[in-house]
Amino acid sequence: MKIHLGRFADSGTKAALKTLIGQFFPGSKAEFRESSVIVSDFRPETAADFVPAAEALPGISWVQMSLSEECPLAVSAKKKSHIFDFSKGRIFIAGPCSVDTEENYLSCAKALKEAGADALRAALFKPRSSPYAFQGIGLAGADIIKKAKEITGLPLVTEVTDTRQIEKLVGLTDILQIGARNMRAYELLKEAGRSGMPVLIKRSAHATLREWLLSAEYLLKYGSSEIILCERGDGIGSEFPVNLDMIRAALKNTELPVFADPCHSAEGASAATDAAVNALAFGADGLLIEAEINPHKAKTDGRHTMTVQSLAALIKDKK
């Protein structure tokens, strides 16, 4: 930790800071320099409340912390999964944007299995910008996704949008998904962590690596031990559908598996395919893809949904 001293820091500032460091970090080491103070040998989890207290002192400019100090669990966590074997290649999670009818979803699930998918998107709940848009089939679709798993043998990935949904999904789905809109929904993160289930967490548009890893830190702190980071992009209109630099930064700073969602920020299925290829080239461990037998008939997001045939070709080429 590096505490930057301002122009008007004086002996009183340093004395107050020394006292504060002793209160928050007993047994730590503090090296006072001309324009900064370096603090080491402290427990990272005690630092979150120290920072605002230190920055409130007259003469303190700002406090700089490394990712390992702010996100000790996320940075030290290992690539771990009892569902996927990452040693055998990239992982492809695919399925419709939302579950609609039993006939459509089961037909699609069978086709995705044949295409080489490793897991199924089982989207029962859909957070939408408009309150009038289709919000997902909800728990009425529980039997549908259960049948899909029985038929295909593939694990299920289901987005949660409310803390009350989680206990109902334990034992039904295999991986909880935290969507980009809810990356900062901290009560949802806590409850997902308490479930002990594997969690895939997307990065919110324009969120920093620090913010993304802090959200993963919530999941790990509250009980999840298997986390997948998923880069989602910064929205339609961005230079690239997925932020490739963010994928590279996540891979550099943590050993957690890093996936990409190439569809949601892509302007069409063709652009989504290109984004998928680019994400894998930058080292992504897997992809979360929207794929349908007939995308033009999809209830939601058909525009950037791949066909099963396109997905099969992608898996064959990039697995």
Regions found by a protein language model. Give the residues of each.
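Alpha-helix-loop-beta-strand connector modules within alpha/beta enzyme cores
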Residues: F134-T158, A192-P198, M246-V258, H304-K319
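Autoinhibitory propeptides
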Residues: S36-L73
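Active-site mouth loops of central-metabolism enzymes
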Residues: R90-S107, P131-Q135, V157-E159, G179-A180, ...
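Catalytic beta/alpha-barrel core
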Residues: I137, L154-D162, D174-L189, M197-L209, ...
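Glycine-rich, proline-tolerant flexible connector loops at the mouths of alpha/beta enzymes
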Residues: R121-L139, E292-G302
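Catalytic alpha/beta core domains of metabolic enzymes, predominantly
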Residues: S195-N294
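N-terminal amphipathic alpha-helix/helix-capping segment at the start of soluble metabolic enzymes
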Residues: M65-I93
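Hydrophobic faces of well-ordered beta-strands that scaffold small-molecule active sites
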Residues: R90-P96, D118-A122, L156-T158, L176-I178, ...
